[in-house]
Amino acid sequence: MKYIAICDIETTALPEAGHFHCAAVKIAGKDHPPKLFTDLNRMLSDFRYVDKWVFHNGLGFDVPKINELVGYEAIKPEDCIDTMVVSKLVDYKKFNTHSLKEIGVHLKVHKGDYDGGWDTYTKEMGEYCVQDVVVLEALWEYFKPYIMDPSWA
């Protein structure tokens, strides 16, 4: 059985000096809420059996940031399914920014808002991260027929 993890991370706002705050992860197709982590190494250890990782802008941010923060290639780019890339390939005219928020609104799964700062972890930041994974799972389900279709690749 292939395990597909749906994941989002939150870090400080500065990409060049980013500090990990939290990650939310859930296994696709399982009926459980996302699990929240404030320890990146623990998250990677708990999900070491995962075959593929689903992120939104994962190739542009999450995967390189995770690998930079842990100091090794914990998640290979080829093991990342990036729903932002898929959205641009599948629905390039339907969305303007292809942001998680924009596609979530289209799917009627709202991302939520976070007005706090990004310097330190807060409970609200964790809730925001978990909700991002809820939205991301809806994107995964929406795009899965394309992603899993061998003739599309």
State the predicted function of each range.
Residues M1-K93:
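Conserved RNase H-like, two-metal-ion catalytic cores of nucleic-acid enzymes
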Residues N41, G60, H98, V130-V133, ...:
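Conserved structured core elements
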Residues R42, K65, S99-E102, E124:
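Exposed alpha-helical structural elements
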Residues E73-E78, H110-D119:
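Short, surface-exposed acidic
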Residues P77, W118-A153:
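Mixed-charge, glycine-rich, non-catalytic linkers/tails in nucleic-acid processing enzymes
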Residues F55, Y92-N96, M125-Y128, D132:
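Generic alpha-helical structural element
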Residues D46, L69, L89, I103-L107, ...:
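Residues that form generic nucleotide/phosphate-binding pockets
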Residues C80-G112, E137, E141:
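Charged catalytic and DNA/RNA-contacting regions of genome-maintenance
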